[in-house]
Every structure is written in structure tokens, then in C-alpha cells.
């Protein structure tokens, strides 16, 4: 088993690689399930920044894998009985994706991937009744968060070393328990890729 894993890693590193940087916006929904099993409807999606730096490799001529680091703001707003509140959170984590690449000609390609991510909150506040509440001691925010989903990317190769792309990614977190908070970010981003 170790030999197979080593052979796979060596073969990936020997194939074509590119480094990708993207910037964009997360539109994040919070799905809160209380201890009675209800889903309150007072939460509304809000936008936040997305940054990522990743390395992409070819597994074959038309199959890609990537892994990298991400910075995300997963924000949300709402009101209860006309009392407004908001959540502002910053998460840093790791992400990976795997999927096929379809060449459309003239350097244009469409890539669909299955994605997985793990992230942890580095800063978070709730604004409520004209003051801020630190979320670092709230386990629903501060615990390690895993997410799963998919992405679609449209890319254009400018020259053999430089390409540009636009990407849509949808992720869901799956926390279970008597009272849970799940994040559902939809991310729109643009970026540049640098090939070796």
C-alpha cells in the first residue's frame, strides 16, 4: 500500500502543474437547527471575501486534482422581533478538488470538480443590541468545520504559462447534534493560473 501511494505521489508531481490564485465573494447561508429540531427563518445570507492559493496537477490528460489554502469570510445577518443582528467571521483552511476537464477549443476549458474543505475560525463577532459578542468561545463557530460540495470553472489559457479563470463553488457543512449550525457558502471568484 505504501508503494502504491508513493508511486501515485511521484507520478502526480511529474505531470504538468499550475499554481492558481483567486479572489471572490462568498454568499453564505447559516442553517441553524435548534434542540427541538426547528429551523428558524430569521437568518439571511450575507456576503464576505474569498481568497485562495492552490496547486493543480493533471492525473491524466483530462482529469485534474488540486489542493491549497483558503481564507473565507462566512457572514450572515438577521433580525428577531425587529432587533437586527449580524455575524462577521474569518476562517482559514485547506481545500481540495478532483474532476474532469473538458477542452472547448481555442484555449478554453470547462472543469467540474468534487470538493472537500476543512477550516477553522480565526476571528468572529456577533453584533447584537449595539455591542459585539466574541464568538471564539462558541463551539458552533470555533470548532473545526468540514465542508463538501462541487465547483465549475471556465478557463482561458492566454499563453503556455498564464491562464485566467472564473469559478463557481458550492459547499455544505454537515454538523449533527441536538443544536447545530451549518454553513452553506456559494462562492463566485476570478483568478489567474501560472503553469510550470
Map each language-model feature to its residues.
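Sec-dependent N-terminal signal peptides
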Residues: 3-13
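Flexible, solvent-exposed loop segments that connect beta-strands
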Residues: 30-43, 71-92, 120-144, 175-181
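Predominantly the C-terminal beta-signal and adjacent terminal strand-loop region
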Residues: 20, 74, 139-141, 145-196
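Outer-membrane beta-barrel channels and translocator barrels
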Residues: 16, 58-60, 103-107, 157-161, ...
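Residues on the lipid-exposed face of transmembrane beta-strands in outer-membrane beta-barrel proteins
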Residues: 25, 49-57, 69-71, 94-102, ...
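Short glycine/proline- and aromatic-enriched beta-strand/turn motifs that initiate or cap beta-hairpins
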Residues: 16-66, 185-187, 193-196
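Solvent-exposed loop/turn segments connecting transmembrane beta-strands
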Residues: 43, 59-61, 104-106, 176-183
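Helix-adjacent hinge/juxtasegments
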Residues: 85-107
Amino acid at each position: 500500500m505504501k508503494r502504491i501511494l508513493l508511486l501515485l505521489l511521484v507520478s502526480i508531481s511529474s505531470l504538468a502543474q499550475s499554481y492558481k490564485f483567486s479572489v471572490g465573494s462568498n454568499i453564505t447561508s447559516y442553517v441553524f437547527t435548534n434542540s427541538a429540531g426547528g429551523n428558524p427563518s430569521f437568518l439571511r445570507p450575507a456576503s464576505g471575501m474569498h481568497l485562495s492559493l492552490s496547486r493543480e496537477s493533471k492525473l491524466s490528460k483530462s482529469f485534474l486534482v488540486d489542493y491549497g489554502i483558503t481564507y473565507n469570510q462566512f457572514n450572515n445577518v438577521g433580525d428577531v422581533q425587529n432587533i437586527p443582528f449580524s455575524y462577521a467571521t474569518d476562517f482559514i483552511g485547506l481545500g481540495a478538488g478532483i474532476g474532469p476537464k473538458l477542452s472547448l477549443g481555442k484555449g478554453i476549458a470547462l472543469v467540474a470538480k468534487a470538493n472537500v474543505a476543512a477550516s477553522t475560525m480565526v476571528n468572529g463577532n456577533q453584533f447584537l443590541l449595539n455591542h459585539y459578542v466574541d464568538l471564539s468561545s462558541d463551539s458552533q463557530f470555533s470548532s473545526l468545520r468540514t465542508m463538501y460540495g462541487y465547483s465549475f470553472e471556465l478557463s482561458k489559457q492566454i499563453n503556455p504559462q498564464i491562464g485566467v479563470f472564473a469559478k463557481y463553488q458550492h459547499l455544505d457543512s454537515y454538523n449533527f447534534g441536538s443544536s447545530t449550525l451549518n454553513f452553506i457558502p456559494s462562492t463566485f471568484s476570478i483568478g489567474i493560473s501560472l503553469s510550470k
